[in-house]
């Protein structure tokens, strides 16, 4: 190749070189967290050449950006071209779940399970879709299979607890949340789910301790504050409820529900003026 050819290349080489440069720059940008630039490079590369590997990189960028609706059509095309690629199809199913496309997610998982009935991730994602569709019994079956195959699949155990909660099966919920808290006592979501289960089976003192532990981990957990406050009130600890709501309002002055709850406690304590003021503030923050 002559000197000028080595610089400028033939038109074909130039086109190929541009594609490679854009793709490689896009991948490097993705790895560095420069996601908008990565998207720009990879889209430009695909305008030059239809390439599955580049589509996969672009889909990955969109997933990192939480742009699931943009990733989905790319994954659909890739899975149609590579129907036997298990990891790709699992990613497709997961993305469908992010977009709450439950029926399609269930269908994709059914195809995966037909190929491998012991694929725990497909069982989990199928159960996620079944929960979304209200098919709780099938979801429980799949999640039980999943946790039997992989006892350390904590997301599956948590999802089963959530499905059982939707069914009102609180004793069964408690069994799962106890196991989760044992595996990771510092996990806020596990602690919160366990506290809710304890409160629903009538173990109020333990539930109070558990909600207090949640707030030790995260004092900004609004739902935990309201649940704990209701427990304080139901066990005649109105002074603690009042203190809890006041501290929450100090931390989060826009916490309308805390104003409303504190107003209710003040009313029970015969502080009608204070109750009216809190209710007014609650309505200002969140008009009903």
Language-model features: where?
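Helix-start (N-cap) detector for alpha-helical repeat units in TPR-like alpha-solenoids
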Residues: 19, 52-53, 86-87, 120-121, ...
């Amino acid at each position: 190749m002559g000197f000028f050819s080595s610089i400028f290349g033939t038109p074909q080489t130039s086109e190929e070189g541009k594609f490679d440069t854009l793709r490689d720059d896009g991948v490097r940008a993705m790895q560095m967290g420069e996601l908008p630039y990565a998207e720009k490079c990879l889209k430009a590369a695909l305008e030059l050449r239809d390439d599955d590997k580049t589509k996969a990189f672009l889909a990955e960028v969109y997933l990192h950006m939480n742009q699931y609706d943009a990733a989905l059509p790319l994954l659909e095309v890739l899975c149609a071209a590579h129907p036997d690629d298990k990891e790709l199809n699992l990613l497709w199913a997961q993305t469908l779940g992010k977009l709450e496309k439950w029926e399609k997610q269930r269908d994709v998982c059914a195809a995966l399970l037909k190929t491998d009935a012991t694929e725990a991730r497909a069982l989990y994602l199928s159960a996620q879709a079944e929960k979304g569709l209200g098919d709780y019994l099938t979801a429980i079956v799949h999640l039980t299979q999943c946790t039997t195959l992989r006892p350390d699949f904590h997301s599956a155990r948590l999802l089963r607890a959530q499905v059982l909660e939707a069914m009102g099966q609180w004793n069964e919920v408690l069994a799962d949340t106890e196991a989760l808290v044992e595996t990771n006592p510092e996990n806020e979501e596990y602690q919160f789910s366990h506290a809710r289960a304890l409160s629903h089976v009538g173990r109020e003192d333990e539930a109070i301790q558990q909600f207090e532990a949640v707030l030790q981990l995260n004092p900004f957990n609004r739902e935990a504050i309201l649940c704990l406050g209701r427990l304080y009130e139901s066990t005649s600890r109105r002074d603690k409820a009042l203190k809890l709501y006041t501290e929450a309002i100090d931390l989060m002055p826009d916490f309308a529900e805390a104003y409303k709850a504190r107003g209710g406690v003040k009313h029970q304590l015969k502080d009608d003026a204070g109750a009216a003021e809190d209710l007014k503030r609650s309505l200002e923050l969140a008009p009903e």
